[in-house]
Amino acid sequence: MTIEQVKDYLRVDGDDDDNIIRTMMEASKEYIVSAVGEYDETDKTANLLFCAIVQNMYDNRELMQSDIQQRKAIEYTFRSIILQLQMKKAIKGDT
């Protein structure tokens, strides 16, 4: 995904945060590769997870302990999508 696509997802205007968004994009890709084994940029589910991870990083640059419930919900969502991607990869490997 391009930085412009990610900024559209984040609803970010301007270029002030481009460097930090690029860093978050790299970290998001590494996160997905570590969890699934690959990041298929043609997979819409993978792209959704990619953007959701970047958004989580961007929105929570200063995580607070009082937001534990919200973080747990986000982590559950990520795990659910990661499991779906792992299953897709396993199915592709069997064909």
Predicted regions located by residue number:
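Divalent metal-cofactor coordination and adjacent catalytic microenvironments
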Residues: 1-95
